[in-house]
Amino acid sequence: MPLFSTDKFQIEIERNWKNIYNISETVIPPDEREVAAMIDQIMEYNKKFVENKGYEPFLTSKYPDKKLAILTCMDTRLIELLPAALGIKNGDAKIIKNAGGTMVHPYGSVVRSLLVGILELGVEEVMVIGHTDCGVQGMDGKEMLELLEKRGIDKQHIDIVRHSGIDLENWLGGFESVESSVHETVKGLKE
């Protein structure tokens, strides 16, 4: 199977996510046809991309040429901007993205991804990069929980997670400044 083919099954799972988790209709945009049409357009584009071998200019090994991993924010403005600003190209680095470009837990996916990069893929340097106007800056965990409840997440489910020892307010909370967030993340990764 070509490197960049997609799986319709995964899309169907995502379309039915609200039914699996009993989330109210407010989570899904009002016009599901628009969403379905957008997904169909993406999948059709991908089909043609694979058929035309559009992926060939991007082929590289799984090992980063610059032996570099970058932890950064998932902000849409960084998709092309960050590599351009750093002078890196496809194949140069492992880029790990999440909300805020932070490490929330020492046993979370960020640390796991970095360990795989270091131990299996030859990463020797790790950069943590924040950015101005980050949506996570100033985020309030309590307000996020209220938004979840407004979106139909049952308070009982939230309480179950709380009683299992997860500090949801902290987990969903943001940071006060980008600079301090980067410093705290670097400090946490070094520990």
PLM region descriptions:
Residues V111-I118:
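Short secondary-structure capping micro-motifs at structural edges
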Residues F9, I13-K66, G101-P106, L119-L121, ...:
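Divalent-metal-activated hydrolytic enzyme cores
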